[in-house]
A protein has these predicted regions:
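Conserved beta-strand and immediately adjacent loop positions that scaffold enzyme active sites
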Residues: 19, 27, 110
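A generic structural signal for short hydrophobic patches within well-formed alpha-helices
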Residues: 119-120, 132
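Active-site-adjacent beta-strand/loop module that shapes the phosphate/pyrophosphate-binding cleft
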Residues: 24-26, 82-103, 112, 116, ...
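Charged phosphate-binding loop/patch that engages nucleotide di/tri-phosphates or the phosphate backbone
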Residues: 129-140
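Acidic, metal-coordinating catalytic segment for phosphate/diphosphate chemistry
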Residues: 1-19
Length: 140
């Protein structure tokens, strides 16, 4: 299995947020945005969020996983998804290496480990199917 590792410079790409496709036993972790969220309430998406001042996308992705779903993910275990990040202001990564069990914060009301084939059964944020597909393709 060959993986594409790309060093991402947030100044170069000007990413504003970072998100992670977390894969376990072929299933993907999705989180449901709370009903009070301003953008896409009650829709499923990925753990992630905005970069803090001076933060790079890898560190932001790792931090957001811990804050939002209580999973520890080392930045060195995150694989960049250039296909879906290329022309967006959002950096997308995937990983199969994490520790802990999901526990939600106030921003989310549910989480599911789903078979990617079942994604159409959920109300999801835009581009989520393509992002998950890109992550799964990168695993092969």
């Amino acid at each position: 299995m060959s993986k594409i590792l790309i060093k991402v410079q947030d100044k170069e790409k000007n990413f504003q947020s970072a998100h992670v496709v977390i894969i376990k036993d072929g299933n993907v972790l999705i989180v449901k945005r709370s009903d009070t969220d301003q953008w896409m309430p009650n829709h499923y998406g990925l753990p992630g969020g905005k970069l803090e001042s001076g933060e790079n996308p890898l560190d932001a992705a790792s931090r957001e996983c811990k804050e939002e779903v209580n999973l520890s993910v080392s930045p060195k275990d995150l694989i960049f998804l250039p296909k879906v990040s290329k022309e967006k202001q959002h950096a997308f990564y995937f990983t199969t290496k994490f520790s802990g069990e999901p526990k939600l914060d106030f921003e989310h009301s549910d989480f599911q480990w789903i078979n990617p084939k079942d994604l159409s059964k959920y109300k999801v944020v835009p581009d989520l199917p393509e992002i998950i597909s890109a992550a799964l393709e990168s695993l092969q």
